[in-house]
Amino acid sequence: MVSLFQDYLGHNLLEVVARSTVFEDYVLTKEEVQQIVNTHFEPLPFGYKTRKELLNLYEAWVFVHLFSSSDIDITTFEDLHELISSGVTDKPQLEGHFRSDDFPVVISGSTYQPPSVSRTEAQADFNRTFNLLKETLSSDYIDRYVKVEQSLMFYIYLMRRQFFHDCNKRTSTLFVNLLFNHYDLNCFLWFPTLEELDKVLGRLKFCYENQGHIEDYEFVSYLKANWLVDFSE
């Protein structure tokens, strides 16, 4: 049986893929994405990296759409990152792997510095936080809106934590959508438009630099009001 999430993503797949490069400061049209998907690496008016990024994102969104495993864990998160980052980063040895303290991340235009710890510590941090979220998402006694809200709080956690050397925003966005699909939460989180990108990045940087529940909930409210499609409404 096709879920509401799968039906929505299936009908909007090309537009979703096109929007997914917005954090790289460009967005193609649905027609351009279709051309890239259909022709792969035949000569096109796009560079190698653009074509590879779009093909990766197309494959990653199909992975989210078709995901049918009985459980989601840290391996799912790493697999999704590998699909998205394959062949488009400057450190291929880190594609699909948590970064360590040897590879610090710098947030452009922000004073915030993501934690740099060993890979083992980073994985343990993820597992602790994600296991708590899974308890909430698996419960029959917690309202759906609370589960959606907590998933978006986890999205902020992933953005702030920057577990990978690159492609963190793309991986975080697809992963939270995979959660929406797997736990049948009847909603979909869009990437922002190019026109609204600066506003979103500004709000995100404010969350980075002012780490508090009020700031995080304000960003969650913004996401719900602007970029979340709720199929139950």
Ranges and model annotations:
Residues 1-233:
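FIC/Doc superfamily catalytic core
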